[in-house]
Amino acid sequence: QMREALLMQADAGMVGPLLVNPDGSEQRGCRRDIPTPWQIFCVALLFHKFMPDHPRFRNFNHTARPLPDENSIVQAISGACMLVTRNAMDKVGALDRKFFLHFEDLDWCRRFDAAGFKIVFAPHAVVEHTRGVCSRQRPIRVEYHKHKSLITFLRKHFTAYYPSSFMAAVYFVVAMRFFAVVLTKIFGLRKGRPAAWERLMTESTGSEP
């Protein structure tokens, strides 16, 4: 079905399936927008919680939106499962090694779009994905690389379009969130319960350790 989705869309370079959790629910991140510094800022400050339907403040994950009946063009899919064409990969290049962990898929999606290739979400191609299995042993290190990659992503793609003062504010918010996540992970692990900030980070980015 993913291969058919690529063949049906002449200018498609990448396709992703509907990722589901083991319980059958849709997994965040398999259809989403490319997060901008403004969106990161709004999600970090919970603006999307108070105004979820406002176009300037809503979350960039599409999980809360109804599933499309047919293949649809999206800004980004999840790196957990991607099918790309050889032609597109030859023109765009491989994944950027500057991203050690997380956000390499969003970077790739943005580069595919910049090269003129469409990104397709195929809702009828269903893949079960269990998140976080490979990195549960070192959760704080994972969070460090996740937040570091977020800053790398923002610097690479948006510094030319946003005032330096606003970008500095976004980096500060990301750094504060990292420290909050670390603290809640420490206390969450000690008390044996998930941390609220960890859930927020997952919700906002669509990424999981």
Regions found by a protein language model. Give the residues of each.
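Residues that scaffold the ATP/ADP-binding catalytic core of kinase and kinase-like folds
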Residues: G29, I40, A44, K91-V92, ...
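A short, conserved alpha-helix in the catalytic core of glycosyltransferases
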Residues: Q1, P66-V126
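Short, flexible, basic/aromatic active-site loop/helix in glycosyltransferases
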Residues: I34-Q75
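Active-site-adjacent helix/loop segment of glycosyltransferases
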Residues: R110-K191
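Short, hinge-like loop/turn segments at secondary-structure boundaries
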Residues: C30-T36, Q137-I140
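Membrane-interface aromatic/basic loop that binds lipid-linked glycans or pyrophosphate carriers
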Residues: G192-P209
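Conserved donor NDP-sugar-binding/catalytic core segment of glycosyltransferases
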Residues: Q1-R31
